[in-house]
């Protein structure tokens, strides 16, 4: 078991960081490669635990998968249609295997998935969407089993609620359906747009992505192609917050400002000088006062829930107090008690947290509870006085590519150590 050992400092986190490809686009794209009858190449795929698990799952299903810079996938030889518990128990994204399997092969089964413990994220919306396309779904022995006689059939589907995961499932499955599918109340996240762009690159006919109505004209087969994964807007935002709370100056390269406009607006409101270019974003907090801001998470293009923990920390370190309202997931304030162990000030009332006016943080032993919460704890350790030990960092490895190396390049004193060495 590995942990992060961080020696805190009042030194600003400053410099340049290259942003990786987006995990939340890479995973559905890798699963969508199951739709392709010819080889595909996916570039800018981040090196993450969930990506490794997905590649292993694709191999288990019979695909040929290799990584040499880009990820190369040949799914022409897929001969197994079950995503087993031992592979998917740690990763909720595994449900994305179901749509491509039933769409291309007429059958598929996926063990009910695991992942971050941040509240209920049921697969009901995925199941209902596939049923509307004509699939028969059964829940047996911990598995979601889907079958269809012949091809799926295009349908007019209105999502009961906005869901990124279910939008991806239906969109991918509908590419090989007979007829046209219209998906209303669809999620609008950039990662959905990127997944649709990949599907079109291999021969699909998807339009309207990025709006709340996506149209998919079914085709008989999908071939091969090349796609480069979009930049990770959450990693971008995380490093911008790290610079902001430490009074630093940073340039995030290989990223796009339009991916996180709501986050940039809140950083400017907090007092940061934010500049943008075609493929970079800079933030300068030098000599500026950090001000608390009010945040309300909501589906894209509003403020993303995956940046809530980082802005909770920002508010804790800012002048004044800010109100954080979490509307996407319940139970997503688990990082706050850990930050309070370091001396942070916050009050939680239901889905609202009031944070601010913390007079410095002190190093402590803290425990990561989910992916984004762990990022806020790591940043807190960088700016705290004394030593911080962050436990359960396997959470952070699910979503951040070499975070300790990137923070070290910005001036942080952080190392990955085995529990036996502490």
Swiss-Prot record:
Entry EC number(s): 2.5.1.7
Highest taxon of source: Bacteria
Entry binding sites for phosphoenolpyruvate: 23-24
Any GO BP annotation: cell division
Record-level Gene Ontology MF annotations: UDP-N-acetylglucosamine 1-carboxyvinyltransferase activity
Keywords: Cell cycle, Cell division, Cell shape, Cell wall biogenesis/degradation, Cytoplasm, Peptidoglycan synthesis, Pyruvate, Transferase
Chemical reaction(s) catalysed: phosphoenolpyruvate + UDP-N-acetyl-alpha-D-glucosamine = UDP-N-acetyl-3-O-(1-carboxyvinyl)-alpha-D-glucosamine + phosphate
Record flagged with keyword Cell division: yes
Main location, first listed in the record: cytoplasm
Functional pathway: Cell wall biogenesis; peptidoglycan biosynthesis
Family statement: Belongs to the EPSP synthase family. MurA subfamily.
The protein, known as: UDP-N-acetylglucosamine 1-carboxyvinyltransferase
UniProt organism field: Aliivibrio fischeri (strain MJ11) (Vibrio fischeri)
């Amino acid at each position: 078991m590995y942990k992060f050992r961080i020696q805190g400092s009042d030194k600003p986190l400053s410099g340049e960081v290259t942003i990786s490809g987006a995990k939340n686009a890479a995973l559905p794209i890798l699963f969508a490669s199951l739709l392709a009858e010819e080889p595909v190449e996916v570039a800018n795929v981040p090196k993450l635990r969930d990506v490794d698990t997905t590649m292993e799952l694709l191999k288990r299903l019979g695909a040929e998968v290799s990584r040499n810079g880009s990820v190369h996938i040949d799914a022409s030889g897929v001969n197994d249609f079950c995503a087993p518990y031992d592979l998917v128990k740690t990763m909720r994204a595994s449900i994305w295997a179901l749509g491509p399997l039933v769409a291309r092969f007429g059958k598929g089964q996926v063990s009910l998935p695991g992942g971050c413990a941040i509240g209920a994220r049921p697969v009901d919306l995925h199941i209902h969407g596939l049923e509307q396309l004509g699939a028969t779904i059964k829940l047996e022995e911990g598995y979601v089993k889907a079958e269809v006689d012949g091809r799926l059939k295009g349908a007019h589907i209105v999502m009961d609620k906005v869901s990124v995961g279910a939008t991806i499932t239906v969109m991918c499955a509908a590419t090989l359906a007979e007829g046209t599918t219209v998906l209303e109340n669809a999620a609008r996240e950039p990662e959905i747009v990127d997944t649709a762009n990949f599907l079109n690159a291999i021969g699909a006919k998807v339009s309207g992505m990025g709006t709340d109505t996506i149209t998919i004209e079914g085709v008989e087969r999908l071939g091969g192609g090349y796609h480069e994964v979009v930049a990770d807007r959450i990693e971008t935002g995380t490093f911008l917050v790290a610079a902001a709370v430490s009074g630093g100056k940073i340039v995030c390269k290989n990223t796009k400002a339009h991916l996180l406009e709501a986050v940039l607006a809140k950083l400017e409101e907090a007092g940061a000088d934010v500049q943008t270019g075609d493929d970079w974003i800079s933030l300068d907090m030098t000599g500026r006062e950090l001000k608390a801001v009010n945040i309300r998470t909501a589906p894209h293009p509003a403020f993303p829930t995956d940046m809530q923990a980082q802005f909770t920390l920002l508010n804790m370190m800012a002048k004044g107090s800010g109100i954080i309202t979490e509307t996407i997931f319940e139970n997503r304030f688990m990082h706050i008690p850990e930050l309070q162990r370091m001396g942070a000030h916050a009050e939680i009332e239901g889905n609202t947290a009031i944070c601010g006016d913390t007079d410095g943080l002190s190093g402590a032993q803290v425990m990561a509870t989910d992916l984004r919460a762990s990022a806020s704890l790591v940043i807190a350790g960088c700016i705290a006085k004394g030593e911080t030990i962050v436990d359960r960092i396997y959470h952070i490895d699910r979503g951040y590519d070499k975070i300790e190396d990137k923070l070290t390049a910005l001036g942080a004193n952080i190392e990955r150590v085995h529990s036996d060495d502490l």
